[in-house]
């Protein structure tokens, strides 16, 4: 990566290992000399000031909490109820402050070579009653790092997501194929990887493909 690069990280679904994959990619880029930080732009299911995903990122990246974590820049919006952002914000009776999120992301981009912004759930998760995560990705103009896996059904979910990404003109920066957690059917997992790789080569020839191992 050259200069200040911001990427939004999202996936086919929740519980697909986004946080694990985000930390892996950040660790990889840091090892390659690209100073990278992660951000969870909307965290739900946590008390004020705490983000379990950012804590996981730092642990897997081999880092202590960073000053930007303490300043709230890596976790600008936190809601207590474990639900999609539109519902969590309604339950907490507080609207999502998108200006606060944007400012935090911009500050991080000034301090680091790359910022990986982790989404909440999948691309079609509602952030508000009128806006989905994919709307935020499109409006921000940031390239997308997309996480999929080899579990049964992921080909369908992945290709539907690819069609939505292509239709909206979003730049697909990287596709991460997550082998974590272990326990998936190895035959299905191998075939899914081959199928998705061929699809990317045909439809997104400039997109990188990264395999995320079980660490």
Kindly give the residue locations of the regions a language model identified.
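Glycine-rich phosphate-binding P-loop
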Residues: 9-22
């Amino acid at each position: 990566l050259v200069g200040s690069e911001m990427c939004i990280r999202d996936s086919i679904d929740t519980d697909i290992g986004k946080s694990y994959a985000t930390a892996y990619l950040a660790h990889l880029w840091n090892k390659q000399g690209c100073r990278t930080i992660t951000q969870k732009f909307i965290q739900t299911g946590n008390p004020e000031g705490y983000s379990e995903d950012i804590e996981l990122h730092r642990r897997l990246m081999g880092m202590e909490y960073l000053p930007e974590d303490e300043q709230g820049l890596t976790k600008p919006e936190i809601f207590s109820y474990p639900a999609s952002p539109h519902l969590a914000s309604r339950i907490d009776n507080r609207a999502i402050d998108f200006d606060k999120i944007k400012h935090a992301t911009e500050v991080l981009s000034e301090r680091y070579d790359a910022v990986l912004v982790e989404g909440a759930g999948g691309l079609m998760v509602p952030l508000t009653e009128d806006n989905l995560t994919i709307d935020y990705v499109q409006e921000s103009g940031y390239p997308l790092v997309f996480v999929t896996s080899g579990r049964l059904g992921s080909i369908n979910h992945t290709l539907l997501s690819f069609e939505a990404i292509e239709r909206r003109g979003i730049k697909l920066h990287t596709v991460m194929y997550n082998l974590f957690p272990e326990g998936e059917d190895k035959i299905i997992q191998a075939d899914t990887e081959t199928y998705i790789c061929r699809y990317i080569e045909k439809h997104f020839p400039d997109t990188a493909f990264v395999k995320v191992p079980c660490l």
